[in-house]
A protein has these predicted regions:
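Non-catalytic, solvent-exposed segments at the cell envelope interface
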Residues: 2-13, 31-358
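N-terminal Sec-pathway targeting helices
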Residues: 9-25
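Single-pass alpha-helical transmembrane signal-anchor segments
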Residues: 23-33
């Protein structure tokens, strides 16, 4: 029996449709492989740090502490703290173990800035900012932890928070935050200040509102001529702005660091995927982390969309009214170093409010 023309056309259409479907599936597969290859290549640029990274001996840590005798805060109107009131191993932090298990709809990523030049070893953490993603409320909180807070550093003598990172890296800093403040950290990201400048330049600078005193402080010792008001700061200027301290206080310094971080987020939110790609190529090589590739991908898929609509909040620990700052005299004729003595329980309460997902 002869096939009708209609049957022939139908057969050709089926073959054509099948070919088109196969081509589409092949393109989808090719695109998937290409995306996987690109993402894997990007993540391969990151420096992954073993959680059991090298730690300093207690003797080496003591040597680092004595270096602060020459680099203490020079402010003259601060009181000398009574050495008797300096926290001991028993009083520096609450005695009950701190909960460190995951907190459900809360994800805590710790951003650590260290003042280290290329080729140098691990230094003290100059900036410690906890980024808290609350998936229930859609809120992203930036909480700065003051580097001069006098804390219990597990395995070492009590000293300032910024020494924890130099003594034992990310893992010891995380443990220190858990013991003193009850903060569970899900992952860490470390950026050197030298790389921080490059990142800002890649994004074309950040927009910041300056006071005249801040502008004068940035201009000092440079050919720059910044004025008060809204300014676009390139990498070197933004870094100098972030590190202004003696103009007012370390408290304001931490606030400036968060200002720059939020300005960076605003810049990133305005970029297209095409604009983002060459920047990612550079940025990935600037950071180190203790998170795995799979963890980074999972968190990026889950949390990155929050950037476009999240409400941002800012906090500082210790919070006003819960600490006393002053110089500690440890040798005759020397002031010693500057530190904050803290009401830990009051600050734990504030942190519990930040982590509250209800």
């Amino acid at each position: 029996m002869k096939k009708s023309k209609t049957d022939g056309k139908s057969s050709r259409w089926k073959r054509t449709a099948l070919i088109i479907l196969c081509v589409i599936l092949a393109l989808v597969l090719l695109a998937t492989v290409a995306v996987y290859w690109y993402v894997d290549r990007l993540l391969g640029k990151i420096q992954y740090v073993d959680p059991s990274e090298a730690t300093l001996s207690t003797e080496e840590a003591v040597i680092l502490q004595t270096e602060d005798l020459e680099t203490m805060d020079p402010t003259e109107d601060l009181p000398l703290l009574d050495p008797i009131t300096i926290p001991t191993e028993e009083t520096a932090a609450p005695t009950e173990p701190a909960p460190t298990e995951p907190m459900g709809d809360i994800v805590n990523i710790l951003l650590i800035g260290q003042d280290r030049r290329e080729g140098e070893g691990r230094s003290r953490s100059d900036s410690t900012i906890l980024v808290t993603f609350n998936k229930t409320t859609g809120t992203i909180s930036l909480t700065s932890f003051m580097r001069d807070a006098y804390v219990q550093i597990p395995g070492y003598s009590n000293f300032k928070l910024n020494h924890a990172f130099q003594c034992g890296g990310m893992s010891l800093l995380n443990e220190t935050l858990a013991v003193n403040y009850g903060v569970p950290v899900d992952g860490d990201v470390v950026v050197d200040f030298f790389q921080f400048k490059k990142l800002i330049d890649l994004l074309g600078g950040v927009e910041v509102t300056l006071t005249q005193k801040e502008a004068d402080s940035i201009n000092a010792g440079s050919p720059w001529n910044l004025k008060a008001g809204r300014q676009i700061l390139d990498g070197p200027k933004a870094l100098k702005y972030s590190r202004i301290r003696y103009l007012d206080s370390d408290y304001r310094r931490a606030e400036r660091q968060r200002t720059v971080l939020l300005a960076l987020v605003d810049k990133i939110k305005g970029l297209s995927v095409i604009e983002m790609m060459p920047i990612l190529e550079e940025v990935m090589g600037m950071v180190s982390t203790n998170m795995s590739k799979d963890q980074i991908i999972s968190l990026a898929v889950e949390l990155f969309p929050m950037l476009t609509s999240a409400k941002f909040e800012q906090h500082q620990i210790p919070t006003p009214g819960t600490f006393k700052g002053g110089n500690v005299q440890v040798r005759p004729g020397l002031k010693g170093w500057f530190q904050y003595d803290i009401d830990f329980e009051a600050n734990r309460r504030l942190l519990r409010e930040i982590f509250d997902a209800d």
